[in-house]
Amino acid sequence: NKKKLYALTQFYESGLFNHLQSLKNAKTVILFGSMVRSDWYSESDIDLFIYGDDDDFEIGKYELKLKREIQLFNAKNKKKLRKMGMGLVQNIIQGYFIKGTIDNLGVELKCLNS
């Protein structure tokens, strides 16, 4: 899909992917939403999920570079992930994994149902 490839190329060339991969205390980082589904348009935001600590994420820098708002969803621990709700979490895990794997969330996802 050309639209998806274009978006991913922009994120890579801006340095966003490298920056997200370098976040020391982020266990999992996932791009999801319209950018991954390829149904984005010029005003669409960028949906990102970070499991773990996102304190080092330079959100403003990349919003300026990409000329798009970044909608950040964060869960620092199991309790926060549980509060996000299963529907949102299912949407997130269908996204593009920038860092980590689904295994990083496996135990935590089971806890959502408990």
Spans of features found by a protein language model:
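Catalytic core of pol beta-like nucleotidyltransferases
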Residues: N1-K27, V36-S42, Y51-S114
